[in-house]
Design a protein with these regions (language model features):
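Short loop/turn motifs at secondary-structure junctions and domain boundaries
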Residues: 52-56
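Conserved GNAT-fold acetyl-CoA-binding loop/helix
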Residues: 28-48, 59
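Acyl-donor (CoA/ACP) binding surface of acyl/acetyltransferases
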Residues: 1-31, 64-176
Length: 176
């Protein structure tokens, strides 16, 4: 489990389905995906993350408010195809009623720190559809820089942002 000032990030359980489905089936939340998720796709999402935990020791984690225990989204690290390479990527989905409160930034920063502290990766990515300003603003706020713009069959054009271990260490030193 990862803990931040306001959030807990924990492994998914099947009990998270209803709260996750509310997020993933919402057209506004999923506007940067080809389509919102149906029930089957949402169940598969949870199963995929349970498989990732078993295979890699990480995946997307449920994001819950510390104060209330309410499920507000997910955030974590998965292995994603970024312009033909399988790379470690921080992703996040936050319920729209919690947008613009810094929750994605807080969760993604905690995942970034966890990844550099608990894996051997020398670079961590986030990728998103070019129209997803909120997502790349979160990446920039967490020290990532745009490293690639590429055609992506899922997204028309995708942007990839990244931070290296060295850049992360320098950020940590500056914040200390």
């Amino acid at each position: 489990m990862i803990e931040t000032q306001r959030l807990l990030l924990r492994e998914y359980t099947p009990d998270d389905f209803d709260a996750l489905y509310e997020i993933m089936s919402d057209a506004e939340t999923m506007q940067h995906y080809p389509a919102p998720f149906d029930e089957a796709r949402t169940r598969r999402w949870i199963e995929w993350n349970l498989e990732n935990y078993a295979q890699y020791g990480f995946g997307l984690w449920a994001v819950v408010l510390k104060e209330t225990g309410e499920f507000i989204g997910d955030c974590g690290i998965t292995i994603q195809n970024i312009d033909g390479e399988m790379l470690p990527e921080i992703g996040y989905h936050i319920h729209k009623k919690y947008w613009r409160r810094g929750f994605a930034k807080e969760a993604a920063r905690a995942v970034r720190d966890w990844a550099f502290q608990n894996t051997d990766y020398d670079i961590i990515y986030s990728y998103m559809k070019y129209t997803n300003v909120g997502s790349y603003s979160t990446a920039i706020a967490n020290g990532m820089k745009k490293v690639k713009e590429y055609p992506d069959p899922k997204n028309t054009i995708s942007y990839a942002y990244a931070i290296t271990r060295k850049e992360w260490e320098e950020l940590c030193d500056a914040e200390a």
